[in-house]
Design a protein with these regions (language model features):
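Non-transmembrane alpha-helical segments in soluble domains
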Residues: 16-20, 94, 98, 160-164, ...
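Residue-level marker of structural boundaries
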Residues: 24, 105-106, 226
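PAPS-dependent sulfotransferases, especially Golgi type II membrane carbohydrate sulfotransferases
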Residues: 183-291
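Short, conserved catalytic/metal-binding motifs centered on acidic residues
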Residues: 11, 92, 217
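Conserved aromatic-histidine-acidic binding/catalytic patches
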Residues: 2-7, 85, 147-155, 205-212
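N-terminal pre-catalytic "stem/leader" segment of glycosyltransferase-like enzymes
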Residues: 2-47
Length: 291
């Protein structure tokens, strides 16, 4: 069982479209029951647990892959499902932080940024998604023990080729079209952002505050970039550069990429509606910390 830890603003939505097309009805965008979800609406603290996974398995016979914002390697899935194999993508912490701010803040004045960057729940997001607490050393320990593959948003195409080799899934389709792009959104908050001068994000003061808010994330990211990712590249059995170019050629000529109709229908018309009425089991909203 593969489990994708979807960390916000790391190109995870694009990767999820790849997993949907590659695994079909053996893939589930796993979600929490509505009542459980509301307890962690802001920082997504609740974890997918064994009951959530069992519920998905009952609806998805042959389930081989799950993905979601609430999939966490510290949340107990590994003890309930010893064969589960976690993977994720990380992104440069400052770039990811700014992207999340621009996507979620709602108001984009300098004062709004001051409030955002002062809110501890926004700090060290990637570290907390891995470890449940803003401690890079703990996240590194969990990665060493439980997370078997980590891609990098900054090396997305190369990471997709490496991921395909690691998954060893015959139906893997690495071609993609980027989704959930900020420039394509037209929510009221996006119109507000477009009307606001966000040049303050490029000032030395803002960069310093962002760095301070993501100090543990930076330690984690540096560890992955210098220790984990190079090992994955070294272990690749083929000519990685050539295979990346082949993926890029296929991307340019692929046209529109459609998810198979039946998995999309099942996810939207069967699985999601069922979650409105599902009762949460153990409340894991207190697992880990949100600081």
């Amino acid at each position: 069982m593969y489990a994708f830890i979807h960390i916000e603003k790391t190109a995870g939505s694009t990767l999820t479209t790849i997993l949907r097309r590659s695994f079909g009805t053996r893939h589930c965008d796993i979600r929490l029951p509505l009542a459980k979800r509301r307890r962690g609406e802001r920082d997504r603290r609740p974890c997918v647990d064994a009951d959530d996974l069992q519920r998905a398995q009952r609806l998805y016979p042959g389930l081989s892959c799950i993905a979601g914002h609430n999939v966490k390697p510290y949340g107990g899935l590994a003890s309930s499902w010893p064969d589960i194999r976690f993977f994720t993508f990380l992104r440069d912490p400052a770039a990811r932080y700014i992207s999340q701010y621009l996507n979620r803040a709602g108001v984009y004045t300098r004062e709004a940024f001051d409030s955002w960057v002062s809110s501890r729940w926004t700090h060290n997001w990637q570290t907390k998604k891995i470890a449940g607490v803003p401690e890079a050393d703990r996240a590194i320990e969990i990665i060493r023990q439980r997370v078997e593959f980590i891609g990098l948003t900054e090396r997305f195409d190369e990471s997709l080729v490496l991921l395909g080799q690691w998954l060893a899934e015959p139906g893997y389709k690495g071609e993609y079209r980027r989704v959930n792009q900020l420039k394509e959104k037209s929510r009221p908050r996006d119109l507000e952002r477009e009307r606001t001068d966000t040049g303050y994000l490029d000032t030395d003061d803002s960069r310093q505050r962002i760095a301070e808010a993501n100090a543990e994330d930076q330690k984690l990211y540096d560890f992955v970039v210098t220790q984990i990712y190079p090992r994955q590249v070294e272990a690749y059995p083929g000519d990685l550069a050539v295979d990346v170019r082949h993926l890029q050629v296929r991307n340019r000529s692929a046209g529109r990429l459609y998810e198979p109709l039946w998995p999309a229908f099942y996810r939207n018309c069967v699985y999601k509606p069922m979650l409105r009425f599902a009762e949460p089991s153990v409340d894991l909203s207190t697992t880990g910390e949100s600081r």
